[in-house]
Amino acid sequence: MTHKYQILYDTLISKINASTNLEINELPILDDDGYDIMYQLYDMFMKKHNLPIKKFIIEEEENKDFDTITFDFKNMPNELKLLLYIFAETHYKALNNL
């Protein structure tokens, strides 16, 4: 069965030049749907590359109202950094009509 975000994942991956070294410390602030989709893209990347899901997660905090995930961008492969950054930037612009 195809993942519901497979087309989005493939489109973003096709835009990435993995040789680009991007310094990311944090991503734009997103809505709940944006964070959920971003985590799904992260999960898809990790599974595709047979990496443990928590390899680039520094901290996970679950609250009554929301969950927080802190990613380890410093040690993350450039392809994954760019995947998350391009999605977050595009989603943020769409949310804010930029």
Swiss-Prot record:
The organism's place on the tree of life at top rank: Viruses
Protein name, entry field: Uncharacterized protein 348R
Species assigned in the record: Invertebrate iridescent virus 6
